[in-house]
């Protein structure tokens, strides 16, 4: 398939790890994060990539890093391959548009999730308990309802499998009171600002996941920010309370895999071309809407 980067191999550069989507290298005092076109579903990486997906994720992150830089510093050093240290400029053709040279921060062991609407695992929790992550919500809310106020619902990072939702009290035990309060405050501020920007463009940010780390003793924003892989974006025009919403993400892929009754165990099946093209179009569409 044209223009699909499933994996990078940068000779002479130390590969630290391959995540579900990103290849992470170490160079001098920095990390190089390369977003490939890999796509995962149900925690399994699929053999088929989505053209340009890595570039779109990177460009959306850069857009949001710039928009919230008044709230918190981030890990970006440069996204211009010509400015990367040697021998990286030689790989410009692969790296351009899909990579970031970043500060080597120490990641917090907690993922910071903010929910403004009731959806996904939050909706499931609410149906069972009337709460999300130990936060009591008003009675009688329906699926996709806007919450009275956005809520901070952290989770622990799982190396394998699903992340586990935790309460704020548990977050304090893991991070300490000061850091826990700070990431909560920063996460909510970022979400509120981004939600206002997106809404003006006809997009609802239902929920999103962010990551923070320490760099030289200072808390900074790391990883990706407000992308279709880390957030649920809905169309404001098509929003209907009480129902599941269409998201600008890989839902088309998940729906297809459910329809063929795949057992969710590796190896995953190949995706047909029409599913790949439709998914690529969803990613391109949200990029165009947000950055226009």
Swiss-Prot record:
Keyword terms: ATP-binding, Ligase, Nucleotide-binding, Purine biosynthesis
UniProt keyword annotation of ATP-binding present: yes
Record gene name: purC
Cross-referenced Pfam families: SAICAR_synt
Family per record: Belongs to the SAICAR synthetase family.
Pathways per UniProt: Purine metabolism; IMP biosynthesis via de novo pathway; 5-amino-1-(5-phospho-D-ribosyl)imidazole-4-carboxamide from 5-amino-1-(5-phospho-D-ribosyl)imidazole-4-carboxylate: step 1/2
UniProt keyword Transmembrane helix present: no
Protein name per Swiss-Prot or TrEMBL: Phosphoribosylaminoimidazole-succinocarboxamide synthase
């Amino acid at each position: 398939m044209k223009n699909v980067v499933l994996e990078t191999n940068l000779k002479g550069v130390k590969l630290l790890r391959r995540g579900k989507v990103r290849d992470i290298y170490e160079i001098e005092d920095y990390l190089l994060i390369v977003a490939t076109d890999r796509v995962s579903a149900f925690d399994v990486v699929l053999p088929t990539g989505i053209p340009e997906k890595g570039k779109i994720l990177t460009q959306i992150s850069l857009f949001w890093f710039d928009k919230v830089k008044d709230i918190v510093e981030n890990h970006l050093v440069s996204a211009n391959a010509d400015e990367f240290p040697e021998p990286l400029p030689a790989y410009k053709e692969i790296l351009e548009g899909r990579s970031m040279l970043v500060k080597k921060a120490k990641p917090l062991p907690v993922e910071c999730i903010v929910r403004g609407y009731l959806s996904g695992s939050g909706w499931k929790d609410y149906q069972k308990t009337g709460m999300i992550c130990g936060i009591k919500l008003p009675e009688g809310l329906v699926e996709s309802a806007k919450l009275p106020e956005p809520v901070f619902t952290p989770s622990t990072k799982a190396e394998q499998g699903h992340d586990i939702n935790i309460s704020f009290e548990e977050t304090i035990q893991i991070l300490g009171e000061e850091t826990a309060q700070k990431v909560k405050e920063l996460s909510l501020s970022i979400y509120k600002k981004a939600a206002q920007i997106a809404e003006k463009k006809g997009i609802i940010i239902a929920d999103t996941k962010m990551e923070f780390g320490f760099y030289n003793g200072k808390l900074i924003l790391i990883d990706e920010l407000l992308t279709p892989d880390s957030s649920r974006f809905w169309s404001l025009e098509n929003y209907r309370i009480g129902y599941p919403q269409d998201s600008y993400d890989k839902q088309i892929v998940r729906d297809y895999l459910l329809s063929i009754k795949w057992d969710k165990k590796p190896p995953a099946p190949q995706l047909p071309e029409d599913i790949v093209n439709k998914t690529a179009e969803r990613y391109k569409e949200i990029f165009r809407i947000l950055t226009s």
